[in-house]
């Protein structure tokens, strides 16, 4: 009797669970809540956060998404700056990373699309923007700062601002 009940519950519970997977449509709505002037382009969705351009690219068939912020031309990067970016990728860039592609330095966050949560995405956008803002100085995603400086408050202010734009979708 208990085996039958367990079998029924095991195979029907999933059918009643609400699907909370991130979709391209849901992510696009979150982006529009962040920046109502965001534009859908052939390459993705372009938005602006604090005067910094952000490009979000999605590949639903591959279950991937990428948020990218252009930072600098590779030609202008010194070996010392490149080394500093690699160090930052290890300890201060956090979930976002410095990357090089198409002769540019980028702040990039890459994640499986379906597993992405709203707050995680908003934190990722804040981190990629902070990589651009702190390039050449702190090289920090800003989410975790050790010590009593001002950086954590600046980062938290950006995350709070993004969280307050729009409703949960």
Regions found by a protein language model. Give the residues of each.
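Sec/Tat-exported extracytoplasmic proteins
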Residues: 31-38, 89, 132-139, 143
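Short, internal acidic amphipathic alpha-helical interface segments
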Residues: 68-110
